[in-house]
Amino acid sequence: MKRVFSFLLTLCLLLTALLSGAALAEGSTQITIGLVGEPDTIIPYMYTADKDAMVIMQMMPYLFKRNDETSIPEPLMLESCEFDADTLTYTWKLREGYTWTDGEPLTIDDVIFTLNTLASADYTGGASTNVSSIAGYAEAHSGETVGMSGVQKVDDYTMTVQLSAW
């Protein structure tokens, strides 16, 4: 009898421990992530460690997402993404309806600002390699120009990105 009682008590304690964090309060917007250390930054283009990325990835959507089955990037925040192989130029059309936390609309100007920030001579983060194949990167990164020549606004929700090489 003692063994049965001990087993049931152990099982109850184990189930309590396993299920203690399983339910969220209705309407809760809190997320809990187990990390090996405290994030150094939550600025998306300034992170260098996986622990930072784990938090940042929960904060906002991205222009592209990785297809879980094929590992090929697919548009997420983009309504369309077209590529012209002759000119090595992408045309990105941002989905309307995204807003900043203050309610202001997210426009293609914000995307262009971010890409040019990553190419800037003043940028010290590790993500500049993400834009290094865009035309005009070398000039922007050296401080010779402000912004990349391969990044052009078409309208408030559309832009072109020309690569420097394939």
What residue spans do the PLM features occupy?
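Surface-exposed binding/hinge segments that line
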Residues: A127-W166
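Aromatic- and charge-enriched surface segment that lines or borders ligand/interaction sites
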Residues: E79-A127, T160
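Positively charged n-region of N-terminal signal peptides that target proteins for export
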Residues: M1-L9
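Sec-dependent signal peptide cleavage junction
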Residues: L18-S28
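Bacterial N-terminal signal peptides
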Residues: L9-L18
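N-terminal lobe/hinge region of extracytoplasmic solute-binding protein
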Residues: G34-A85, N116
